[in-house]
A protein has these predicted regions:
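Bacterial Sec-dependent N-terminal signal peptides
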Residues: 1-25
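Mobile cap/lid helix-loop segments that gate and shape the active-site cleft of serine hydrolases
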Residues: 204, 208-211, 226, 266-309, ...
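Cap/lid segment of the alpha/beta-hydrolase catalytic domain
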Residues: 120-121, 127-222, 232-233, 278-281
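C-terminal catalytic histidine-bearing segment of alpha/beta-hydrolase fold enzymes
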Residues: 292, 338-380
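Glycine-rich active-site/cofactor-binding loop and its immediate structural neighborhood
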Residues: 87-146
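N-terminal targeting or regulatory segments adjacent to alpha/beta-hydrolase or S9 domains
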Residues: 17-94, 102, 138
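Short beta-strand/loop motif that positions the catalytic acidic residue
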Residues: 312, 319-321
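Alpha/beta-hydrolase fold nucleophile elbow
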Residues: 236-248
Length: 380
């Protein structure tokens, strides 16, 4: 009898979880009226739809609105207080692990690669890691880790095979003559949970941040802006030649950073561009329709993704999406690319925006990494 009671108690939570009512309002984590919401998105602050006709004034106004929607930033530190935790000699460049005060609230660790080619200063890339639903590592996805636990090192190499074709993007760029910098985003790597990785807690943490009047996604962007400012102060870096790049969430970070930081001169984004009407509909059978990693409250009342990315105009920008990418349907990428081309063309600099659709799934193989480096070679 005791065993029967225990079994019944074990079954009850499962039964409660699967309870359904005849009527409902949400389906596949989306409101059933999602297409009506999409129809009401008018984007009044987009270039060409705004009543501001001077491009510089529009950029200033639109950027100010983006920052307003990003809510309060983390307070700046009094000093960076950069400490070199370790160094490793590599083939033609040196790897360093740094720790620095990124905000008054927190210290952050990063990897930096410096070419040893006789030059005192180099062009630099803020290389921004992906999401991948894999939070155990962050910066280690971009640069070969060292002085780390073997579990972390193995995880980093496994991730390269899965997403980057077995080539560490940062180390490849360092061999091509670039200073490369990569830091963890909030919740990734050495900025994760004390209790360990649990992606199901991400949304709860993001919600708690909003209760503080802060935005977790915005903190990621604010941090990327701040690390770019730090990068400009380092003696090995030519402060007038800083670019940024990333894949997936790293691509989102790259075009957001390009749009919001004047320090960035050139940007490249691989596999993250779409329009909200394609991202937030049930039509394409997607299992995920965005999330807190790119959720900035109220911003969609004013601009869509390509409108925000267009704040990077007239900078040279490269966008690559995959035709087999299940996360970003081709119609959404094509619509976004067309909108951005309209903006760059309106300013007489259409040749500075390059958008490409590749016959590939979601990821950044060595061929795409090479394409990005060639773009930087030409424009940075």
């Amino acid at each position: 009898m005791k065993k029967i009671v225990i079994l019944l108690l074990a079954i009850v939570p499962l039964a409660a979880f699967s309870q359904k009512r005849a009527l409902y309002e949400f389906k596949k984590n989306m409101p059933v009226y999602c297409d009506s919401l999409i129809a009401d998105m008018k984007y009044p602050l987009a270039w060409g739809q705004s009543d501001i006709h001077d491009f510089s004034q529009w950029k200033e106004t639109a950027r100010r609105k983006v920052f307003e929607c990003m809510m309060t930033p983390p307070p700046a530190p009094q000093a960076w207080n950069v400490v070199v935790l370790g160094e490793e000699q590599r083939d033609g460049y040196v790897a360093r692990k740094l720790e620095f005060q990124l905000s008054k609230y927190y210290k952050v660790r990063a990897y930096m690669l410096v070419p040893q080619d006789g030059r005192k200063k180099h062009p630099a890339i803020n290389l921004l890691h992906d999401h991948g639903a894999h939070l155990f590592i962050g910066k280690e996805k971009m640069i070969i880790p060292f002085q780390e636990d073997s579990v972390i090192i193995k995880d980093a190499f496994d991730w390269q095979l899965k997403v980057y074709g077995g080539q560490f993007w940062g180390d490849y760029m360092a061999r091509r003559g670039y200073v490369v910098f990569s830091a963890d985003a909030p919740l990734w790597g050495e900025r994760g949970r004390e209790e360990g990785v649990d992606r199901s807690k991400y949304d709860m943490i993001a919600g708690n941040m909003q209760m503080y009047g802060r935005c977790l996604s915005a903190f990621m962007t604010y941090d990327d802006i701040a690390t770019t400012e730090l990068l400009a102060t380092l003696p090995e870096v030519d402060a007038d030649r800083i670019g940024c790049a990333g894949c997936s969430m790293g691509a989102y970070r790259a075009w957001m950073l390009s749009a919001l930081s004047d320090r960035i001169k050139v940007g490249a984004a691989v596999c993250w561009m779409v329009t909200s009407d394609v991202q937030l509909t049930l039509k394409y059978g997607r299992s995920e329709n965005g999330g807190f990693a790119n959720c900035i409250p109220a911003l969609r009342q004013y601009m869509d993704y390509p409108h925000i990315a267009s704040l990077a105009c007239p900078k040279p920008m490269l966008f690559i999406n995959g035709m087999k990418d299940k996360l970003f349907p081709v119609p959404g990428a094509e619509k976004a690319f067309a909108e951005m081309h309209r903006v760059w063309d309106s300013q007489g600099v259409g040749e500075r925006l390059v958008t490409e659709l590749w016959d590939m799934p979601h990821g950044c193989p060595p061929e795409a990494q090479q394409r990005v480096v060639e773009f930087f070679d030409k424009n940075l």
